[in-house]
Amino acid sequence: MSYWVELWESIFTPGVTPVLAKSAHVACGALVAVFLGLYIGTKSIHCLILFFLAICLWLSLTWFLVELAHARVNNDLQMSSQSANKNDDNSNNQNPSNNKEMSDKESDSATTTQTFSVPEELLRARTTANNS
């Protein structure tokens, strides 16, 4: 499939697709290069200011894409925990001999926590972003 067709279809796809993210980075890089070239050619302070604004735009775009990725991971974890809880509830409801266990689980549900395996790079990136 053509790059332009993929880009056009990614506009109508919910979320951020790799083609759209790559295109945004290429566009920001081109904008930074143009303003750098204009500054070198004209030595105008205005071009230098626009160059730094373009860099800030690129950094904010990158930050936004990372936050979207974190939100997607958190949403996936939440959905998997909800489906796991529904599966546990369904298995307990099918076995009537576990009524006491089910009531114990319901009473302790506020204090119990579940652990999930999250890739270490995501946790490290999230921790680094929060500490900054």
From Swiss-Prot:
Residues 80-132 are annotated as: Disordered. Residues 80-100 have a biased composition (Low complexity). Residues 41-47 are lumenal. Pfam families: Pkr1 (PF08636). The chain crosses the membrane at residues 20-40, 48-68. One of its GO terms (biological process) is vacuolar proton-transporting V-type ATPase complex assembly. Residues 1-19, 69-132 are cytoplasmic. Its main location: endoplasmic reticulum. The keyword Secreted does not apply. Keywords: Endoplasmic reticulum, Membrane, Transmembrane, Transmembrane helix. GO terms for cellular component: endoplasmic reticulum; endoplasmic reticulum membrane. Signal peptide: none annotated. Functions together with the other V-type ATPase assembly factors in the endoplasmic reticulum to efficiently assemble the V-type ATPase membrane sector V(0). Belongs to the PKR1 family. PANTHER family: V-TYPE ATPASE ASSEMBLY FACTOR PKR1. This is V-type ATPase assembly factor pkr1. It comes from Schizosaccharomyces pombe (strain 972 / ATCC 24843) (Fission yeast).
